[in-house]
């Protein structure tokens, strides 16, 4: 059934019978059914094939970069690199969730190589941040993904903004996607700050070596081969595409879904399902979003390999229907519209930095 709300049409379900089993036990039964279907088994052949494909794609970009030389067509190579680096980051994300190998060490090894050595991001920073997010998605004070930043993800934070940030937050819905072009730089800056910071960093020197080497090699190659202006344009396009793709892939997952107040306790099943949004689109969506289109299933079963998510979706939807838990899935276009609408609505709570309090009082007289 389709229901219309301020967040747009979502798929909802009938209400749960109060006589049914507690959600904790129903999640346990769902997990048992998923395991019985073999959906928690690793898919090494799939991931090795995907890795080989991405390595070939990266090799093609490098070959094109060398062959084109001093040409503005290099910007197409830059855009392609942004896409390929994002796909490597998706694969690193899956390795961090133990989706590739049975061994945790093997997954960490692959994830660190892909995230730090190929994408140029700190694997330990990502693991720390992402683990907290999965434990408490969209919960104020516990999910770092909705902590105060350039934009605001909930009303109270927007209302507390001041100065230039308030000016951005007031228009953040319309500015959201343009701002994503800077997300690549933001991710690299956070990664460098983490590995060189005072906090605990797992395998610090290895990550420093991988991240610094990756960034240095790309920058050096670009400035050695291309003229100065073209080199800056190349890096600008690569970083913009990388940031936009990463941000646009993760944005529909939770933005516009219910935000859980600080201190509120929910059972695992509801906490994960009610705050997550799936993207309808079949195989193409799974490829483009790196499996993130099955966000509900990913949060319920973080170690589930990408090829099994679609089959799990049918089981989870039916389970939520029986239990009366809202299960949200939308087209990619509708999800982005909802993201913009939600961000604009939150932004209305931001203070106008040019507003005169005295004039405001006169207006109310």
PLM regions and their residue ranges:
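Short intracellular "coupling" helices and adjacent cytoplasmic loop segments at the cytosolic face
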Residues: 12-22, 42-44, 118-123, 142
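Low-complexity, highly charged intrinsically disordered N-terminal segments
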Residues: 16-53, 57-60
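Alpha-helical bilayer-embedded segments of polytopic membrane proteins, i.e.
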Residues: 42-88, 115-120, 173-185, 200-250
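Membrane-embedded catalytic scaffold of the fatty acid hydroxylase/desaturase
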Residues: 80-200, 263-354
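C-terminal, active-site-flanking charged/polar segments
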Residues: 238-251, 255-256, 317-321, 326
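C-terminal, non-catalytic macromolecule-binding modules
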Residues: 247-272
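C-terminal regulatory/interaction regions
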Residues: 354-365
């Amino acid at each position: 059934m389709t229901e219309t709300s301020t967040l747009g049409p979502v798929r909802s379900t009938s209400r749960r019978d109060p006589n049914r089993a507690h959600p904790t036990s129903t999640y346990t039964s769902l997990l048992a059914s998923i395991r019985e279907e073999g959906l928690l088994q690793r898919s090494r052949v799939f991931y090795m094939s995907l890795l080989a494909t991405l390595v070939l794609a990266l090799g093609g970009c490098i070959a094109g970069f060398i062959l084109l030389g001093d040409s503005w067509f290099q910007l197409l190579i830059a855009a392609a690199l942004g896409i390929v680096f994002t796909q490597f980051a998706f694969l690193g994300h899956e390795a961090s969730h133990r989706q590739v190998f049975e061994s945790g060490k093997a997954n960490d090894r692959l994830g660190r190589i892909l995230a730090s050595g190929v994408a140029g991001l700190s694997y330990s920073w990502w693991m720390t941040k992402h683990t907290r997010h999965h434990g408490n998605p969209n919960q104020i004070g516990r999910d770092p993904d909705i902590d105060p930043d350039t934009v605001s993800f909930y009303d109270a934070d927007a209302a507390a903004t001041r100065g230039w940030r308030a000016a951005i937050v007031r228009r953040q819905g319309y500015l959201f996607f343009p701002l994503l072009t800077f997300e690549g730089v933001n991710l690299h800056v956070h990664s460098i700050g983490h590995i060189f910071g005072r906090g605990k960093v797992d395998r610090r020197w290895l990550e420093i070596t991988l991240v610094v080497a990756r960034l240095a090699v790309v920058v050096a190659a670009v400035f050695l081969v291309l003229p100065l202006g073209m080199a800056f344009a190349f890096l600008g396009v690569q970083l913009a595409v990388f940031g936009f793709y990463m941000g646009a892939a993760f944005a529909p997952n939770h933005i516009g879904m219910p935000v859980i107040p600080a201190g509120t306790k929910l059972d695992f099943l509801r906490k994960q399902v009610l705050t997550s949004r799936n993207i309808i689109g079949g195989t193409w969506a799974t490829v483009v979003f790196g499996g993130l289109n099955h966000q509900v299933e990913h949060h319920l079963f973080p170690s589930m390999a990408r090829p099994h998510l679609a089959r799990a979706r049918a089981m989870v939807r039916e389970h939520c229907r029986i239990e009366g838990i809202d299960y949200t899935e939308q087209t990619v276009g509708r999800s982005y519209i909802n993201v913009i609408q939600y961000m604009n609505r939150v932004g209305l709570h931001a203070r106008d930095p040019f507003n005169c309090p005295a004039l405001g009082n006169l207006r109310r007289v």
